[in-house]
Swiss-Prot record:
Chain ranges of the BTB domain: 166-222
Any single Pfam family the record assigns to this protein: BTB_BTBDG
Listed name of the protein: BTB/POZ domain-containing protein 16
SUPFAM superfamilies: POZ domain
Species for this entry: Mus musculus (Mouse)
InterPro entries: BTB_BTBDG, BTBD16, BTBD16_C, SKP1/BTB/POZ_sf
Coiled-coil regions listed: none
Length: 522
């Protein structure tokens, strides 16, 4: 009794460290044995000598030996011990010896398999201990009734019945059946439609191998139609590996893929915010990113729309709001202000695009005044972006999506009268290179949307700070390649007109190539 009191006292001391920790620990306690004493399930041996003794009786293990190293009796060891005892006794057969009552069904199982599930193992051990007590009481009664007579041969051991209640609506009978099937087979086919239910079943069953299998499948099946549910599942089960995979995938595909489909509506706002803040975010230009975000807001406010709206429809919708203040300062838009603060509006330099920003009455006037003032000062100083310092968070950003059918692909851009060509080249099936080059305005085809509404700089050199990066998905993992942050003067004559070349070797396709740069003062 002194030993039990001292052990109990030590638990009270640990649990009293802080109020929050105490509350959390109480929620995790469970009852063990006939004495209804509390124990902590996360510990292998918690000082409960009676429970340890009961386990030793079931496993036919010497109590004195178990006390020398009680942790060896953790559940992960039970399967091996039970299997050895069954094989030695010669009672192993193919007949099910465990009945699981769950979801209105009775599932026939075998105890060697259920030890892959922490939940089923605990239920089984609890039921087994209770059966041992009941059998012992029956044997004592028989011995008292026939002290000197012969005792009839005992009937075969009854099947052990365990029951479990599941309240998670994600767990369907089909999904639960697939989870139990995985106890017996390593390769059980799952689909995108039922993987969430199997994941929920694996979580409840504490079936780690199956849970990880579901996570791996979900990471490899990310698509516009699945990204929402897979991300929410990762948050629900605190599976950082899955949530990070969703964030990385969406950072690459928000603009080029999801932003072109009605599934954009389903993207949760917290996920969208993380992606907009990500330095890995891919976009063709800042205006492309703005259009994607405007469409997301439009779809949130027009839930009945089932077709992807054209850009003019979205602009007309926001322009229809009262002109007394901008959309982001009115009730519907105030909650989305943090999303638009992630945009780099200074990266929108086209006169035509700036006119769009002004006329849709979406942004606060102070934002537009600041953007316009920065553009004016940059043009006045020959392109110097004195208001931009950090390349990773403030740079102008442009992108190329290099697809499988391309051998070469390029786009031309104009900033403050300077013209550049960003280009990707495929040298062989696994070798690519990406670079940027300054070009003359006379090299552009006229009329050209690049030079339309654009000024022309006659300066022979332009100091540029830039970085080129490329990302692609290979076997479920993102490969990333990048240059350092490079400071270089770009002229019109080779080799001074061309940037450093990013050369990569990969089997991944498509390749998301991003170009970020600013014009330092010169």
């Amino acid at each position: 009794m002194k030993m039990l009191n001292s052990v109990s006292g030590s638990f009270r001391k640990k649990a009293g460290d802080s109020r929050s920790r105490e509350c959390r620990t109480r929620l995790e306690r469970r009852i063990v044995g006939a004495t209804n004493r509390w124990r902590f399930p996360q510990d292998h041996f918690c000082g409960d000598l009676l429970a340890l003794s009961q386990m030793c009786n079931v496993l036919n293990v010497d109590l004195d030996e178990a006390l020398k190293n009680p942790d060896r009796l953790c559940i992960s060891k039970f399967q091996k011990l039970f299997s050895e005892n069954i094989m030695n006794s010669g009672t192993q057969s193919g007949e099910a010896d465990v009945i699981l009552e769950c979801l209105g069904f009775k599932w026939e199982l075998h105890h060697p398999q259920i030890f892959q599930s922490g939940t089923l193992a605990k239920l089984y051990l609890t039921a087994l201990i209770q059966n041992m007590k009941s059998s012992q009481r029956e044997l004592d009664k028989v011995q008292k009734a026939h002290p000197s007579g012969k005792i009839k041969k005992r009937s075969p051991v009854k099947k052990i019945i365990i029951s479990m209640r599941i309240n998670d609506p994600a767990v369907t009978r089909v999904a639960f059946a697939l989870a139990l099937k995985n106890l017996y087979m390593k390769e059980v086919e799952m689909t995108v439609d039922n993987v969430l239910g199997v994941l929920a079943s694996a979580h409840i069953l504490q079936f780690n191998r199956l849970f990880q299998k579901c996570v791996n499948m979900m990471m490899n099946r990310l698509a516009p139609s699945t990204i929402k549910n897979f991300y929410l599942a990762g948050c629900k089960y605190e599976e950082e590996q899955l949530t990070m995979a969703c964030e990385k995938w969406l950072a690459m595909n928000l603009v080029p893929l999801v932003g072109t489909q009605i599934h954009l509506r389903q993207i949760p706002e917290p996920l969208l915010y993380k992606v907009l803040k990500s330095p890995r975010l891919f976009t063709f230009s800042e205006f492309h990113l703005l259009k994607t975000l405007l469409m997301w807001v439009y779809l949130q406010m027009n839930c009945k729309v089932q077709m992807v709206p054209i850009h003019e429809t979205i602009l007309a919708f926001f322009n229809s709001f009262p002109k007394k203040c901008c959309f982001l300062e009115q009730d519907p838009g105030q909650n989305w202000m943090p999303l638009f603060l992630c945009l780099r509006l200074h990266g929108i330099t086209s006169g035509k695009d700036l006119e769009v920003l002004k006329h849709i009455n979406f942004f606060p006037e102070s934002w537009l005044v600041r953007v316009t003032a920065n553009h004016y000062h940059a043009l006045e100083s020959g392109g110097n972006m004195v208001h931009l310092k950090d390349l990773s968070t403030q740079a102008m950003r442009f992108g190329l999506l290099f697809r499988q059918e391309y051998t070469t692909y390029s786009e031309r851009i104009s900033i403050y009268g300077y013209f550049f060509e960003i280009k990707g080249i495929k040298h062989d099936p696994t070798s690519y290179s990406f670079s940027m080059q300054r070009i003359k305005h006379t090299d552009l085809e006229c009329p050209s949307p690049v030079c339309e509404h654009s000024t022309i700089s006659l300066r022979s050199e332009r100091l540029v700070k830039y970085e080129i990066q490329a990302q692609t998905l290979v076997d479920g993992r993102w490969q990333e390649f990048r240059t350092n942050q490079i400071m270089q003067k770009f002229g019109f004559i080779k080799p001074g007109c061309k940037s450093h070349v990013l050369k990569i070797q990969t089997v991944g396709i498509p390749i998301y190539a991003s170009f970020a740069f600013i014009f330092p003062a010169s």
